[in-house]
Amino acid sequence: MLIGEIMDLNLKNFLEDREEIIRDAKRKDEKSFKDFKKIVEEIKERENKDKIVCDFTEYNPLHKGHKYALEKGKEHGIFISVLPGPLERSGRGIPYFLNRYIRAEMAIRAGADIVVEGPPMGIMGSGQYMRCLIKMFYSLGAEIIPRGYIPEKTMEKVIDCINKGYHIQVKPYKIICIETGEILGEKLNIDNYVIASMSQMIYKLNREGLKFNPKFVFVKRLEGISGTKIREAIFSGKFEDIKNMLPKTTLSILKELYDNGKLNELILKRFEDRILETANEYDLYEYLPSNVAEILEKKRPFNNIEEIKNSLPYGFSRHFRERILSKLEARIPNETLSKYINNYPAKIKILAVKL
């Protein structure tokens, strides 16, 4: 397949995702929830397990650290992976390495029982997608949430707090146990911060009437695994360099794609022309925070993506600029995204099931 044809197909999929997000802002697919519950009951009976374990991971790609956490989770029940998918933009705001259907297959081969589609992380702030994530866990019936963590002094206090049934509040340079008021520390590693944010969002949504109290299972992260190194090696076909970081199932999928000459054409990329068109010609107040829209509209026209990025202010998140590019790429109005989050999940979309 020619490069132009590949980009056309990827753009077609991207635009279909966009339309689906817009539709999901104003509808509920009740049948999808019933169908999902039926499948869960069948798997519970087959596996002779009664608990539902849910985790949220990008699997970009799935490595041994992911598999280790998955195996620890499966000790407690059937395992459901929530895989962010629509628009194929990561929490960092950049395109995923491979599409969600390939990543879902990696999860199934690694041992997951079901993979469902999660929220479109790349166009959301961390609070927005955390809200969607917890609401999805609730809708899936999650009873146990396994999470990998990096050992550090403040994190040990966070774990102790959560294990007591308490919740965490995250403030700039202050991590607090909500119920006791104890200051646990000043900051956390970014991966540990996700756990604290999940706890905080559960508390917040329960205050809004959700009634969700899952048990966390904390899994110490495996050392010596780098997602960046894995992706760099895959780009160059150096699978021997990373065979100790990837489970055989992931390695098999990647090598098969590489040997068949399909890997490079499946690697996802930005639609830079679309971003430039939005930045130069559209009403940016419709899609971006007003302060960002004001800056970009004053500085346009732009000739390339770097000019846009260099014009953007620094946000609270280090991925702020890339997320703004994803917003320009997606052209989903702020009002529509807000309705989408309020209505989330509009459906349970199953990406893969273990047969």
Swiss-Prot record:
Belongs to the TmcAL family. Signal peptide: none annotated. It comes from Methanocaldococcus jannaschii (strain ATCC 43067 / DSM 2661 / JAL-1 / JCM 10045 / NBRC 100440). This is Uncharacterized protein MJ0951. SUPFAM superfamilies: Nucleotidylyl transferase.
